[in-house]
Amino acid sequence: MGETEGKKEEADYKRLQTFPLVRHSDMPEEMRVETMELCVTACEKFSNNNESAAKMIKETMDKKFGSSWHVVIGEGFGFEITHEVKNLLYLYFGGTLAVCVWKCS
């Protein structure tokens, strides 16, 4: 029975690590969900290269929602930005990886 409990805890931990935790967003619901899914896809696809993940997110956001999107991905950064209203998403993915996506033209 102890082995079964251990596997369940491990599965719960893995699910928590792959679920995006939104820290702040002022995006409309539909845009926020789409952007979250894009961030998860990019971070999983380029798990060892944050620069490539950020480039994928930026280029996709530019195509879908117009130009002037910016993306920062990393594990240790602070930020103070100017952004357009209803165009900011800040989330954590994988436990420690932070993603900030915003539009500023």
From Swiss-Prot:
SMART domains (alphabetical): Dynein_light
GO molecular function ontology, one term from the record: identical protein binding
Keyword Cytoplasm: yes
InterPro entries listed in its UniProt record: DLC_sf, Dynein_light_chain_typ-1/2
UniProt keyword annotation of rRNA processing present: no
Family of the protein in this entry: Belongs to the dynein light chain family.
Protein name: Dynein axonemal light chain 4
Organism, scientific name: Mus musculus
